[in-house]
Amino acid sequence: MSAKFDISFANSASLENALAIVLQASGEAQAVAGASEADPGGVIERASKISGFSAKSMATLDVIAPQGSSADRLLVIGLGKPSKLVAHDWLRAGGTAAAHFKKADKVVIYLDAPGVEVSAEAAADFALGLLLRAYSFDAYKTKKKSDDEKTPKKVDVTIVTAAHKDAEKASAVSEAIAGGVILARDLVNLPPNVLGPVEFAEKAEELRKLGVDVEILGEKELKKLGMNALLGVAQGSARPPRLAVMQWNGGSKKDEPIAFVGKGVVFDTGGISLKPGLGMEDMKGDMGGAAAVTGLMHVLAARKAKANVIGVIGLVENMPDGNAQRPGDIVTSMSGQTIEIINTDAEGRLVLADALWYTKDRFNPKFMINLATLTGAITVALGNLQAGLFSNDDELATRLAEAGEATAEKLWRMPLGKDYDKIIDSKFADMKNSSGRLAGSVTAAQFLKRFVGETPWAHLDIAGTAMGSPLTEINQSWGSGYGVRLLNELVRAHYED
């Protein structure tokens, strides 16, 4: 059960029966925001000396409010050195605060730490951190944890800051971003018997209420388009495939659209090339790329982004049955290129091959970025701390990397090249869908590159970051929602009117 926060901004607030949270930068001689109101007895200074608290980044000090304060509890959050503060630290501080709400139903947060410049954007980022940390997924638990049962469904949160008027306006964007990230997390966390291709497409259709144009292509339309690579993956499942096309037209009519394409394998058994049983339950998250694209479209529409954006997601289930695709099959993709199937567990690239070609052919976008939980090889290379970035365009790659640094959804650029491309040549078709273990993430990217033509393109392999990544101040969920904030920042920084 996710906590519900009613967040407001003000220049002062009543502390009666509240949890009071104050922020402190290191090296500020124990000065804290809101000290005169929340801590008239100076208990924070005394407790800091006794405990050795020095306001290091995201360190906390939790004390009972002193006599003379109308608050119930005091929490100090360290910000570290002011010179080292970056935008993402405000999200982390918000998440740290939310983790300490416990049973409080009223919280007052003094944001203006001495020695720290707090902008409206910083205050809004703090609020975003609160919202993201509040998320939890326990919809299918009939008995909640005892702490959760006692947690109030609604917490009144007042953020006290001199920038309160502008922060209130800026927080609307924070709410939009939180909504998109939470949508992506929900999609990844949902069980596969609940979220099939049809049900996922219905989730995409719900974006219409935000003004997104949504078109759903069924099996008949996909066959007519010649999407045999995508259809080949789906043919072993009793659940029919879908292609969801989402359009947000917030920019000028003359502006070229930008496009995001997501892999949406709602469950991946590996097909005939069956995966080991141990850990297969995690393959409900093999649609993390499609979840991120859907979450991004939510954000852009909710905040009324001034850009024309296309989101395309290929939705299939990869199952073994008597009609399933076989190793040795050859399929003709929408592009006309032929593909020899070597491994049916290299299915995501087949879905993306047709989805990318369709997007390029129909919309002629300024660029295309695809997201996919594509290869286990990328987790060997980068673990679950960064996603792999492959691109045929240096400017796009640089902008993506910068957005990754700004949002802490980090990317590491990986190589592409003719020598790698040769590895996926087939004896019997134009290419093969798998070339073995060596350079697995690179050859997968080379495969995708054959379906983008001259369009500037980037491929983000998010196999290590979309699910099961390390828990942070702003994410305590198995499904992380990775990519939503990253791509929203890319659009905001470079592609809005």
UniProtKB/Swiss-Prot annotation:
Protein name: Probable cytosol aminopeptidase
Keyword Cytoplasm: yes
Domain of life, source organism: Bacteria
GO-annotated molecular function: manganese ion binding; metalloaminopeptidase activity
Family classification: Belongs to the peptidase M17 family.
Cofactor: Mn(2+)
EC numbers, comma separated: 3.4.11.1, 3.4.11.10
SUPFAM superfamilies found in the cross-reference section: Macro domain-like, Zn-dependent exopeptidases
Catalytic residue list: K275, R349
Keywords: Aminopeptidase, Cytoplasm, Hydrolase, Manganese, Metal-binding, Protease
Iron-sulfur listed as a keyword: no
